[in-house]
């Protein structure tokens, strides 16, 4: 079976996370994110160039959990896809826009220090094969 891959995005949370709800009642998270860009120099060093800013949204449980756990300035890694759409600007003109739809999002391990708080394990949740002992093999 082939490896399932998705687009990924990394950067930092540039705005305070905003939680709202769709007409159907689903949670929707919106944040502005920043991405720092660098240029490799001939001597092997890197020079920071411009930082770009983009929109990131998430829905349902991912939105609720991200709103609880992320703050402005946090470094993140997300998996999802880029959504391209048309919107109307302040002058009434239709312009092309894009946003990253995060299906999964978490803190960037390479740039974040944190502690993991795991729930206490039980025998039933400790095994990947839980429940298979009752299955007819």
Give residue ranges: language-model regions.
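Short beta-strand/loop turn elements enriched in aromatics
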Residues: 30-48
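Acidic, gly/ser/pro-rich intrinsically disordered tails
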Residues: 1-5, 18-25, 41-47, 64, ...
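OB-fold and OB-like beta-barrel modules that bind single-stranded nucleic acids
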Residues: 7-14, 33, 72-84, 102
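Beta-rich strand-turn-strand
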Residues: 59-95
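Short aromatic-glycine-enriched beta-strand elements
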Residues: 19-35, 96-99
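Short, basic/aromatic beta-hairpin or loop at an interaction surface
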Residues: 46-56
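OB-fold/S1-family single-stranded nucleic acid-binding modules
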Residues: 83, 89-112
